[in-house]
């Protein structure tokens, strides 16, 4: 099958949607499909060969974050070239509501079109105002996908449609291998029971909704020996006992998660899924997360044995209490780790990609994607 993927967000900066699309494309290519991805990317940005670079982008504030989007006449030209040259059987547009490559592709393309919705928010007056313009375009979508129940509900309430739920995917084998390597290294080093437990955070340091300051405040209330590693781009704080390692590669991220004991996700809001929670679970971390609806779903908190422990959003003292509890209670910590590893398997790309392919097969009618 010839598959075209369209991304609204720039590949110049790391992000969950971009990572999801690159992973999905890689899985399908490994299965023998032809796949290309179109999205904003500067000439100097290092991306896989299957990415068609769509040029520069500008930062736009949205949903508590900053998204880098492309606008202008070059977007229209490149979308048309992408569709004509690709001869695609399916065009898969991510975040079709975003005013960038995705929305333009949806307005231009005709034929077998699939869309994935990642974002969620309480409400959007802007989208309500834009609904008369968006609705005719959204009707062109033959197969809708939402990565979480929050994203699905938001789309249905704001703009209609009935997307099915297919979560984000994770290559669990990478994180499982990192965990095994870390365990082997610990065994070779001898008894590691006396070492301080390692707590890890991953997120953009300058984005308040990622909650780093909540974690740093919580550390003031933890009187147990610990080591803390912070991954992510931005301005590092000067904090004793905290190692700011900056932006890391995917392999280094897996390695750090594989050796860590507790992963903390203190995010304040604006999350519709929480892919790094799944990565941490697959790597054998006990997960402590803020009680966002999206995180509660990933942690499966209604289960007899949840896969994560939640704390009150924004409450540094409650976070400190939960971390201290896991440090002191090895049995609970190991139970969370075991449940997390099992939970992560449900998000493995083998399952997720197969579900997406079923949607592709459903929307095909023997015609090619074309410029309308």
Language-model-detected regions and their locations in the chain:
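A short, well-ordered alpha-helix in the C-terminal region of glycosyltransferases
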Residues: 318, 325, 332-346, 358
